[in-house]
Amino acid sequence: MNINVAELLNGNYILLLFVVLALGLCLGKLRLGSIQLGNSIGVLVVSLLLGQQHFSINTDALNLGFMLFIFCVGVEAGPNFFSIFFRDGKNYLMLALVMVGSALVIALGLGKLFGWDIGLTAGMLAGSMTSTPVLVGAGDTLRHSGMESRQLSLALDNLSLGYALTYLIGLVSLIVGARYLPKLQHQDLQTSAQQIARERGLDTDANRKVYLPVIRAYRVGPELVAWTDGKNLRELGIYRQTGCYIERIRRNGILANPDGDAVLQMGDEIALVGYPDAHARLDPSFRNGKEVFDRDLLDMRIVTEEVVVKNHNAVGKCLAQLKLTDHGCFLNRVIRSQIEMPIDDNVVLNKGDVLQVSGDARRVKTIADRIGFISIHSQVTDLLAFCAFFVIGLMIGMITFQFSTFSFGMGNAAGLLFAGIMLGFMRANHPTFGYIPQGALSMVKEFGLMVFMAGVGLSAGSGINNGLGAIGGQMLIAGLIVSLVPVVICFLFGAYVLRMNRALLFGAMMGARTCAPAMEIISDTARSNIPALGYAGTYAIANVLLTLAGTIIVMVCPGLG
């Protein structure tokens, strides 16, 4: 039996789509030195090559892909989006505006200089900034721009062509810039990280190991009684001195949970909870030969929960003000916008931050109720909320504003982005509403993006040879300029106008570019995870601004060139 592969693929859109995705994802795993191509560019390259062979796909698949992607971007940004606007994140907001705004202006100027149409210009902006949200926003606005069919088709083809030609330029140039730009300014990143660590009492270790607390039981001997000197547990402040706290006491065969007025006596058996290194640091005379095994005394359920910050008595407060250890709980991690933050007593908590807390189940539940709520450990997505807000986003995108003879609408991209932000924000405030496991959200977002990239590549592939020969050199120059010049402008603005600490500034710059590989280089250079504070500060708002930039560039200059 003979199988005509070309006819088989052209006759089955679903098969073609998944062949492109499979081949593209394989290609995306290839590395050029230390740089991995990535899924987006892999799928785009494969789809462009197959597009040259006149394979095509139903445009409905492309539309659904970009809608899912942009909606999920909004959901991820939602918990921290408003806190960046309305509280102490004005520096991060201004940095993101400078980065995106300068890139937008430079791209428009270069597009005018080289005589490109709006499709090439917007695609070059998206690729140089390694930002798929720009591509998505521009593509959606073009489709709703009222262009005649042939002109629209050319603009969309050029959009994906510009993106494909400049994506690697933008990625490589930013990674190289992240490696060498810190060396061109007079403040060493490692010194800057240590400086802010001293000022704020931060943990600078980028590779800090996380241990769970353990429970051990000891019999109180004369050495420990002498050390307490008749003081009660409250006066001793035993956790501050040892890193452990007393969970239970057995005295005369009676098991009890001690209060602050309890005084240790000879022969008491105590259950100490603390990290392994805290147990190891205990005075040997307190523990050597005195450890006991008592099933009831040691019968404590240590749990680790992810606590979402929500309540007003925690939002805006420093970690130190929560006094977790006074409540018998241990902090393992602080997560903001999927970025792990330094464990720092002076880190100010935002609504939607996630604290990984360990301790006795009852104590963790108590502290969680005071801070916010325990994140649901479920693999079940609230599809009702997901679909309802998706519909709301589409309806918002249909709104059109009319001014005399000029009209414009938000479009699906802006509508879905706004609806996603609202869903993410409400999820951060209501633990049982709109729950989407992070794995499920990431999968839908990635799948939507890959479908979108496959669609634009197949649509644009037929014209890539002509375009590459005519504008390849110009695209190389423009891509480098748009990738690096806004970074330099952002650095000058942050360093000399905002006067930011350099470690935080470089982290914030990488967040404004939403580039995780470059962020890793900055952290390695600083030998610290301090830059993650800046990265998390700009990342959420930058994703939103980049989507709007794709819309704005088309609305401002629809006939560029």
Swiss-Prot record:
Presence of keyword Calcium: no
UniProt keyword annotation of Lipid metabolism present: no
Residue ranges occupied by any RCK C-terminal domain in the UniProt entry: 200-288, 292-373
InterPro entries: AAE_transporter, RCK_C, RCK_C_sf, Transp_YbjL_put, YidE_YbjL
PROSITE patterns in alphabetical order: RCK_C
Any GO molecular function: monoatomic cation transmembrane transporter activity
Localization (cell): Cell membrane
Entry similarity comment: Belongs to the AAE transporter (TC 2.A.81) family. YbjL subfamily.
Name the record gives this protein: Putative transport protein YbjL
Organism this protein belongs to: Shigella dysenteriae serotype 1 (strain Sd197)
Gene from which the chain derives: ybjL
